[in-house]
Swiss-Prot record:
Catalyzes the phosphorylation of pantothenate (Pan), the first step in CoA biosynthesis. It comes from Nitrosospira multiformis (strain ATCC 25196 / NCIMB 11849 / C 71). It holds the Pfam family Pan_kinase. Its cofactor is NH4(+); K(+). GO terms for cellular component: cytoplasm. A monovalent cation. Ammonium or potassium. Homodimer. This is Type III pantothenate kinase. It is an enzyme of class 2 (transferase). The gene is coaX. Belongs to the type III pantothenate kinase family. ATP binds at D9, S10, G11, N12, T13, R14, V15, K16, T125.
Amino acid sequence: MNPLLLAVDSGNTRVKWGLHDGRNWLMQGVAAQGDRVQLEREWRDLREPSRVVISNVANAGVKGSLSELLAQWKAEPQWITAVPYQCGVRNYYSNPAQLGSDRWAALVAAWVLERQGCLVVDAGTAMTVDALSDTGEFLGGLITPGLDLMQKILVEDLGSLESEGGKFCDYPDSTADALYSGAVHAMAGAIERMAALLAGTLGHMPECILSGGAAQQLQPQLNVNVKVMDNLVLQGLLAIARETSETASGGVVASPEDSIEN
């Protein structure tokens, strides 16, 4: 029986997880951040993993709660942090460790998948737009409010605005639609401006690897080549786990294709 890896992406609003047997994802799940009862229920009958790899960008309390849940298994959790170089990606952040572990894992996954310059976009609670060069250099990136947060900020600061039930329109004729459409345009504009900037650096138009809760809403509004990928962070955690495991054991690091395709 193949050893099992549990990968956990603990974000600001959701916890995503997947159990991998070295070839395929056997199970995947998602729970609202802080919903310990659901995670306990989903993990209660899970086959015991031999490794646990986690990206956590939530607070220390969340890390403590996850640690308590994971204590049911013998494997010591590996909490991922960004490093200067890993899996072919070079981190050019001025302070490499300051880069969020979720962004780092997503960059690793995108590089392993594409092996060329691309934009890596996670449209979650916040949206990140990160640039990869043709040689695997993380050049830098943007952070903006996400689709829901952008509208929430305006509603909270300008309390008379109504935001419920908004939808995207070419010419919005209600406040809710104007807020929603404005947020989509702002996010799409940030992505397209970064794509144009990166195209000038690379000499070719980069593909946009898009993930996150608002990916489906954004994709139709983008005038760039888009590839939507679910669970990009989990895929990056899988690649990182394989490299760190095989490097530690003195083995040959798994090929990029093997690390990402399943």
